[in-house]
Regions:
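A glycine-rich, Thr/Ser-enriched phosphate-binding loop motif common to dinucleotide/cofactor-binding enzymes
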Residues: 29-45
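Glycine-rich phosphate/diphosphate-binding loop of Rossmann-like nucleotide-binding domains
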Residues: 54-115
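Structural motif
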Residues: 13-17, 63-67, 88-92, 120-125, ...
């Protein structure tokens, strides 16, 4: 254990590993797939729209969070040219983000509303309304029934699959664009 921590290993994959408490005292933790999932918020929202039979260019997507953080801003930038309406519900930095998106993409953002076809929550306090809602926070992200796959890689059990993809992504062996959401 000591040597593992000394040599810089900070991630372990097995979900059902029985000694997490002992390893946590040595500074080790299970793999958290949330950074990868949050970086893929826009492609996942588009996949939700496709699954519902919605044309993204005729659909509304809401982004909800307590602040205009990096992943929320990235999702907004990626979705602006791809959806009819982008709705923001962001307490801190939301107005600034709206002005930025208007300058960059010439879009007038809509107020958030319960009838959006897809919504992405970046914070547990954000509203859950919408036809399909991704919740990308906390220890268990809710992907609204989406499955994550990589062409050419045999899919494992969901609990073990996402941490594996996170490790491949963090080490540069997998790009966000390699992922498929269905």
């Amino acid at each position: 254990l000591f040597y593992i921590a000394v040599f810089g290993l900070t991630l372990l994959v097995p979900e059902d590993f029985p000694f997490w408490e002992e390893l946590s005292r040595a500074g080790l933790r299970p793999v958290d797939p949330l950074p990868l999932l949050r970086s893929c918020a826009a492609p996942m929202a588009l996949a939700l729209l496709r699954r519902q039979g919605e044309d993204p260019l005729r659909a509304a997507v809401a982004l909800r969070g307590s602040r205009a953080e990096r992943d929320l801003v990235r999702a907004a930038e990626e979705l602006c040219p791809r959806v009819r309406d982008l709705c923001l519900s962001v307490q801190t930095g939301g107005g600034e983000l709206e002005r930025y998106l208007h300058r960059q993409y010439g879009v007038a953002l809509r107020p958030d509303w319960a009838g959006v076809q897809a919504a992405i929550r970046f914070d547990p306090r954000a509203e859950e309304a919408g036809q399909a809602v991704l919740s990308l926070f906390g220890p268990e992200a809710d992907l609204a029934g989406l499955a994550v796959s990589v062409p050419g890689l045999e899919r494992q059990k969901e609990g073990q699959w996402l941490p594996l993809l996170e490790i491949l992504w963090e080490t540069g062996r997998l790009e966000r664009t390699d992922l498929e959401f269905t």
